């Protein structure tokens, strides 16, 4: 999958390309992550990419022209890589909140061009003419779009085929089917007076599967009850709930 990131701080994305699951995917050429600095497309000796906002106010606004040139360059790279469906995504507090359903849709694209804002944001005309989607990672403000972009890339990359060493691990992650994850345990059997649940050591896989589902359902009900209404249960899961509720 092709990713082009428009950012003033390309070095930050070594966290994606050099480490962990996403780093392994990059080394295996499952993903291609290219960072494009809009300063390379700015005019003048200072390579300025920001200006004061019209109408006054604090801070600076990223200028449309260098960003547009950077996006067009990214589109050329995507085309050279054989990618057709490559929308431009702007990471913004005004965007829709990212969730697992959106991530799964991104997985089906050929690639993404991700625009990272800074300062007070970007010129609205750039958004109107070049941005296809705006996404947020939550209702809070960060210094720029780089961290949200890394969240977006990591969440997509781990869902791509052949990336996870254990495909079942990705399937069982929180939110994949609408439920939170179940409690996880490893050695030792006892820690500060707390024991691993006996059922997890029983070797009875059907009972373990049932226990894990019930734990996930109960945890979601307690911590994120609004998610329960969106969950589609299998016939077996409905039976487990019915048996548990008596």
Curated annotation (Swiss-Prot):
It is an enzyme of class 2 (transferase). It catalyses: guanosine(37) in tRNA + S-adenosyl-L-methionine = N(1)-methylguanosine(37) in tRNA + S-adenosyl-L-homocysteine + H(+). S-adenosyl-L-methionine binds at residues 117, 137-142. It is found in: Cytoplasm. One of its GO terms (cellular component) is cytosol. GO terms for biological process: tRNA N1-guanine methylation. GO terms for molecular function: tRNA (guanine(37)-N1)-methyltransferase activity. HAMAP family: TrmD. This is tRNA (guanine-N(1)-)-methyltransferase. The lineage of its organism: Bacteria, Pseudomonadati, Pseudomonadota, Gammaproteobacteria, Moraxellales.
